[in-house]
Each structure stands twice: as C-alpha cells, then as structure tokens.
C-alpha cells in the first residue's frame, strides 16, 4: 500500500460543474466543456468507491478528510451522500477517524439535509458574500433570481441543528468598499469562521488586465486591515478569520494551512466525476490533467513527477523582489494563478494581489508577533525555556479554550 509523503486535501467533484446557480464570477461552470455528452453526469458508484478506497489508503494523516465540492454537491441528493458515508465506513481501517466536508451554496439545504449532516459529523462551508445587495449582485440562479434569502435560510437551518457552518465570502469590486458592513453582517448572523477570498479574473485584453468585478489589490488589503482592527479590538477568540489565522501561524512558527500561502503547493488536487485527476482547482485543463484514478492510483498521482513539479514551481518561479520581501514568510508569493503582473524592475511573475497582501501582512504583523510572544512567555513559566512552537496539546492561541490539536492545528478550510 503506497502512502502519500505529505498530507493532502482533494476537492472531489462528483457532479462536475453542475450547479443550480449561475454566479457571474464562477470560474468552474465553464469546465463542463471539457467533457462530452457521453460522460456520466455524476460519478458512478464504482469510481466513487475506487476513489474513497484510494484516498483512505493514500492518507498519512491520523484523521482522513474528504472534501465534497462542485458545482453544487447537494444536487447529488441525500441518497448519494448516504452511499458515500457507507463506503467510507466499509473501507476505513478500524479505529481511524473520517471527517467529511461539503462546500455548498446552501440554497437546497432543508431539514433532512441538516439532520444527515449533523448525524454524520460533516463540516459545512457556505458561500455568502455579505449583505443582500452585495451577495445578489453576482450570485443569482439560472433564472436570474436573487439567492441571498435562500442561502441565509440554509445557514440558519444548519445553526438550528447545531452545525456551525464556515462562511466563504468572495471579495469583489463591490463589497471590498464596505469592510465594516460585510464583517458586521457576518457577526450579526452568528458566523464563527469567515474566509475572505479575493476575486481575481485575469483579462489580458482589458486596460487594467483584470475584469471590472475583480477586487483591486490595494483595496483588498485595506478591506482586511479595517476588519482586522475591529477583530483585534473585539473578537479575538470569538470569531475566526482565515487570513488572520494564517498571519498568526507564521508568528507561532507553524506552516501555513492554506495552500495559497505555503512555500510549495500541489497538495490540493481535483478529482472530476469520471475519475480524472487535475493538479489544482484553478488548473482544471488539458495541460494539468495528470491521469485517472481508474488507471493510476491516487497516491501515485499525488507523488508523480509532474504533480511535484507543479508544486515546486510556486517557489522556483518566485520573483527576486518576493525573495527579499519582508513579509515573504507570510505570503510566499500567493497563488500561481494570480502571478501575472511584473515587479518594479520588470521581472514577470508578481502576484496581482501583492500590494494588498503586503499592506495587510505589514499591518497585522506587530499584533500577531506580540500575541505569539505573550503566549510563549505564559507557557514558559518560572525557570523554563519558552517554547518556540505550539504543541498539539497546548491551549489554542486563538482563545477558543480548546486544545490546539482540536482547534486550529492543520486546518485547511474550503478555499474555493
């Protein structure tokens, strides 16, 4: 049995790009063009079982994590997910834990879904772009109707059943101008974890090189700084914000949890509905299709020279300006998909979000460094040497009251 050399997270898309919404910024809807009408509309049971078994066999982690994505995965129906759980229970080794995560637009969530997700211990991520006017600007259904009320109803139902769903908010040219309104809306509805995903749509033919909906880099940095200041004053230990956790991980000597900020990537591939393996969710194209799990095992694909080369390219193509940047350890050049502008001296490969990232990481660094120093001094005690890193059984520095291993250790939230 071949194990992967590192932990990994697969974005599995059993129904491909199929979705009941038609969000105008969605980069995945167009992936339907990769597959002809002869392909299955959903992952067949034999491919599903093969994937689950291979994932379990390949995982080196103490807890095996599955991430179900789309499109919109709830279109598969509850019976399909019951089959998923049944197959996982059939194949998992005795005593080994399995955790499932699902990323959904929440518009189809009802009482039955909530009971199932709660009973089976699913983690849930919901796409919600803030107050109604921001969310509905881009996130409409195929009939052009608004979706905010339906998504919020799904979020509320999940809370009623004891499921604290994570929020994934796409930050774009509209809502980036209103950081306080966006953040306070999420606090008002009871969100405990928020991921802010900047929208970057490359448009080489446009004067700005990006679409009008793209969040301006400096504005995105300011958006994060404004929210960070309110969070630092009022919400440490109450609300988790993924970008803030990532900044803190560096100060605490931890590797970034989100692939965007790691030195290398390649550990978050995609499995499409027919078993095709792609290097990354943002690189689902013919050049990055490495094989199919019906012919090559998941572990072999993860460890393949092409996949490892894809991951190393993140560090190997880092511009010189990034290599000497004061916040490199927090950023590591960002995602490869966004590296399409040039540095001040004309070197290509700079991240479009560089100015915003630098603005935010420079702004928050004194606070998170002080937090780390305070934690080390408290952990050291009289006559002891302050630990340089957080131990698995130490209290989580986020203030949740949980042990680090039960809270922020190794969290790689649903980022797309």
Regions found by a protein language model. Give the residues of each.
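Acidic/negatively charged segments and metal-coordination signatures
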Residues: 373-416
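Local cysteine-cluster metal-coordination motifs and their immediate loop/turn environment
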Residues: 18-29, 279-282, 319-337, 397-409
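Membrane-interface junctions of multi-pass transporters
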Residues: 284-328
């Amino acid at each position: 049995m071949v194990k992967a050399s590192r932990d990994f997270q697969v974005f599995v898309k059993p129904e491909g790009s199929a979705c009941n919404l038609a969000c105008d910024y969605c980069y995945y809807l167009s992936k339907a063009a990769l597959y002809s009408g002869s392909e299955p509309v959903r992952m067949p049971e034999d491919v599903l079982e093969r994937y689950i078994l291979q994932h379990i066999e390949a995982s080196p982690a103490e807890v095996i994590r599955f991430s179900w994505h789309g499109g919109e995965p709830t279109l598969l129906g509850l019976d399909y997910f019951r089959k998923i759980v049944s197959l996982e229970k059939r194949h998992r080794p005795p005593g080994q834990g399995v955790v499932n995560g699902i990323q959904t637009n929440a518009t189809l969530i009802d009482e039955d879904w909530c009971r199932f997700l709660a009973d089976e211990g699913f983690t849930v991520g919901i796409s919600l772009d803030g107050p109604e006017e921001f969310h509905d600007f881009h996130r409409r259904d195929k009939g052009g109707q608004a979706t905010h009320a339906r998504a919020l109803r799904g979020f509320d139902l999940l809370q009623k059943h004891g499921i604290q769903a994570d929020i994934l908010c796409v930050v774009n040219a509209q809502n980036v101008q209103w950081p306080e309104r966006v953040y306070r809306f999420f606090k008002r509805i009871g969100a405990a974890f928020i991921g802010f995903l900047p929208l970057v749509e490359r448009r080489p033919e446009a004067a700005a090189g990006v679409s009008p909906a793209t969040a301006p880099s400096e504005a995105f940095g300011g958006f994060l700084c404004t929210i960070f200041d309110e969070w630092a004053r009022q919400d440490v230990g109450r609300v988790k914000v993924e970008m803030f956790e990532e900044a803190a991980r560096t100060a605490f000597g931890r590797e970034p949890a989100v692939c965007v900020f790691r030195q290398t990537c390649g550990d978050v591939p995609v499995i499409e509905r027919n078993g095709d393996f792609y290097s990354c969710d943002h690189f689902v194209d013919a050049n990055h299709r490495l094989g199919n799990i019906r012919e090559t095992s998941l572990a072999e694909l993860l460890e393949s020279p092409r996949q490892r080369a894809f991951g190393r390219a993140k560090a190997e193509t880092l511009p010189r300006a990034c290599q000497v940047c004061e916040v490199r350890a927090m950023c590591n050049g960002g995602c490869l998909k966004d590296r399409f502008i040039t540095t001040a001296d004309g070197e290509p490969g700079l991240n479009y979000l560089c100015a915003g990232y630098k603005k935010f990481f420079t702004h928050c660094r004194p606070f998170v460094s002080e937090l780390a120093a305070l934690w080390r001094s408290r952990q050291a005690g009289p006559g002891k040497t302050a630990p340089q890193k957080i131990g698995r059984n130490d209290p989580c520095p986020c203030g949740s009251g949980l042990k680090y291993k039960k809270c922020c250790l190794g969290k790689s939230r649903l980022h797309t």
